[in-house]
Amino acid sequence: MLTKFLTAALALGGSLVAASPILKDKRSFVERDGTNFTVFEHAATGAKLEFVTNSGICETTPGVNQYSGYLSVGTNMNMWFWFFEARNSPTTAPLATWFNGGPGCSSMIGLFQENGPCHFVNGASTPSLNPYSWNTYANMLYIDQPIGVGFSYGSDPVTSTVTAAPYVWKLLQAFFTQFPQYENHDFGIFTESYGGHYGPEFAAYFESQNSAISSGSATGTHVNLVALGVNNGWFDPTIQYQAYIDYSYNNSYNQLIDASDRQSYTQTMQQSCAPALTQCTSLTGSNSACANAQSVCYQDIEGPLSQAGNFDVYDVREPSNDPYPPSTYQTYLTSSAVTKKIGAKSTYTECSDSAGQGFSQTGDNSRSLLSTLGSVVSSGIQVLVWAGDADWICNYLGGFNVANAVKWSSQSAFQNTALKSYTVSGKAGGLFKTVKNFSWLQVYGAGHEVPYYQPEVALQAFKQTMGKQGLSST
């Protein structure tokens, strides 16, 4: 979910090192309070991986392995991960990572509320298997980042999307060394909300590291990146602040403002928000200018519009106290019996104010990732930008305009391609268009967390994108 903190993109100087240098890979097994851990120390990156095998929590499908634990990505920096093998053919299935947004929100949201192996239904206090889990098709890796989010704990030097990327890459490098059977598999990055920042930047960083490894200027495992998917993402503030106005006036569910209000807000956008954003035009914009832009645009556009009626910003069809998706999983993850089994060492925090404030101080939210997204599309990997049409906070009008604004060799063809009905087994699920390796999808009847509201549509879109295909109806 998007909690809208301000961030700045600062280059990460120097290499990432752990507290003590490791001369060669080491693997050991330890028992703590009745829980067995595998400990792996990665010589190349100095990372330390510590995890529990087959906890019996969440994924209970017979024969499907799971691993949960921590990667120490730096001094006192312990990043939480939870990995589930595919339910079908894990030795050949692709590998995908999932990141929730914030910035500063846990990927356990996605695991338990959206696309993970288990979910909570009908008010149950314990989870049941999710038949639409994305691990029916792919091996799935959920990561809590930056430090301080979810079960991750320790010191957090990350204050921007750009500074977050190397730590995620480092985790993946250690993961591949511990689980080398997956390193040659097709790999995808899937994310939502502030993932409109995370997704393009992480993909671009991984591709740049691949090039450095190929040229010999860096060492590591080549990541076979084939796909990027971002639903209800926050990519470009100039486009998407205007979309707050347009969507509030014209959506299929709940008109929030009238024509006069729309005109007034549009004038305010042109006179205050847009000029402030102009001062923060790229990742090289100053922290103060970008932070100021976020403050101005929130006060003049987002804040007032979010109070334009009694509605849930994540699902405009519902009142502000909307109880869905249910937060039952948070109570479940505070159970000492559960945390012991999965190897968690900290108290679960769904969204971390401190992690988000780091981004806030650098104005990261006000920086556009549109050009980075264009570079990723131009690289040739399969890219899906999609959105549930009942979400307000990162609404589909903004997402659609972002998709059309992406600069790449087939931009004109993409802009001029008509939308078509997207069906799942003949049932209408939305509107889409695909040109070469780039797709847009509007999902009917879905709020911010698309896989929760429309799991069948989400699973099909995921499979097609991860399978290096453009979207197509079935």
What are these regions (language model features)?
Residues L2-T474:
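Terminal and linker regions of secretory-pathway proteins
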